[in-house]
Amino acid sequence: MRELVKLVCTECGDENYHTTKNKKTTPDRLEMSKYCPRTRKYTLHREKK
């Protein structure tokens, strides 16, 4: 079953994005390079615990 997760910017701490993930196939935390509107650049976004 897919679960909704929030992605948090590692530089400013904002929750800019949300996505779904399958916990059976990807048990570890997601890390994606996404655009952060506050810092106005692409930064690493990690899954919020």
From Swiss-Prot:
PROSITE patterns: RIBOSOMAL_L33. Keywords: Ribonucleoprotein, Ribosomal protein. The keyword Transferase does not apply. InterPro entries: Ribosomal_bL33 (IPR001705), Ribosomal_bL33_CS (IPR018264), Ribosomal_bL33_sf (IPR038584), Ribosomal_zn-bd (IPR011332). The keyword Transit peptide does not apply. One of its GO terms (biological process) is translation. GO terms for molecular function: structural constituent of ribosome. Disulfide bonds: none annotated. GO terms for cellular component: cytoplasm; ribonucleoprotein complex; ribosome. It comes from the Bacteria. Belongs to the bacterial ribosomal protein bL33 family. NCBIfam families: PRK00504.1, PRK00595.1, rpmG_bact. This is Large ribosomal subunit protein bL33B. The lineage of its organism: Bacteria, Bacillati, Mycoplasmatota, Mollicutes, Acholeplasmatales.
